[in-house]
Amino acid sequence: MQKLAELYRGKAKTVYTTENPDLLVLEFRNDTSALDGQRIEQFDRKGMVNNKFNHFIMAKLEEAGIPTQMESLLSDTEVLVKKLEMIPVECVIRNRAAGSLVKRLGIEEGLELNPPLFDLFLKNDAMHDPMVNESYCKTFGWATEAQLARMKELSYLANDVLSKLFDDAGLILVDFKLEFGLFNGEVVLGDEFSPDGSRLWDKKTLNKMDKDRYRQSLGGLIEAYEEVAHRIGVKLD
């Protein structure tokens, strides 16, 4: 499948059209960003690692009955995906307290959350992705009640599948974000799942193995991503 025109360039990925109006090419770049895109650096191999990581995770979620946009792996940095009508809201599942939750509530980082929390955020970098709720989504027309219910159901199902996958690999799935869209009217998982959009800690040491290594200037970003990929069985080379 040949990529044609650039459709959209995000902070770490570029989307291209193809000759099929229902399919797009998603290219993972080496860019890494923080502070809503205000800080950006390039890391060798990052695009390749995240692309193969994401393809692996999406396949696992498909096996569990979660519909995804994934079609096929095209190259080290590219995948073929369905063209979705994206819902402009991020779904976040939190198994442990970290990030904005700690700042907002003043609770201890690492606190186990049982049952896991489900949060919604409006996708808007200029507004720093404000937290919203289901009432906002319905009032402003971002998603219907049925779509929200399905997004929540699929997010918790993904959490069940991925928490076990990472736990078996000696890792804690602290939290993660998912984005959904519509394909022929069906709610489908889009965007990506990688250490860019999740928090993963080593079970024994609690070392951070995700983009917090970049956000907090801990170093060893790609080494951590590759270690996580290796532990869960992603073939990188």
Swiss-Prot record:
Disulfide bonds: none annotated. Pathway: Purine metabolism; IMP biosynthesis via de novo pathway; 5-amino-1-(5-phospho-D-ribosyl)imidazole-4-carboxamide from 5-amino-1-(5-phospho-D-ribosyl)imidazole-4-carboxylate: step 1/2. It holds the Pfam family SAICAR_synt. One of its GO terms (biological process) is cobalamin biosynthetic process. Keywords: ATP-binding, Ligase, Nucleotide-binding, Purine biosynthesis. GO terms for molecular function: ATP binding; phosphoribosylaminoimidazolesuccinocarboxamide synthase activity. Its EC number is 6.3.2.6. It comes from the Bacteria. It catalyses: 5-amino-1-(5-phospho-D-ribosyl)imidazole-4-carboxylate + L-aspartate + ATP = (2S)-2-[5-amino-1-(5-phospho-beta-D-ribosyl)imidazole-4-carboxamido]succinate + ADP + phosphate + 2 H(+). It is an enzyme of class 6 (ligase). GO terms for cellular component: cytosol. Belongs to the SAICAR synthetase family. PANTHER family: MULTIFUNCTIONAL PROTEIN ADE2, SI:DKEY-6E2.2. This is Phosphoribosylaminoimidazole-succinocarboxamide synthase. The gene is purC.
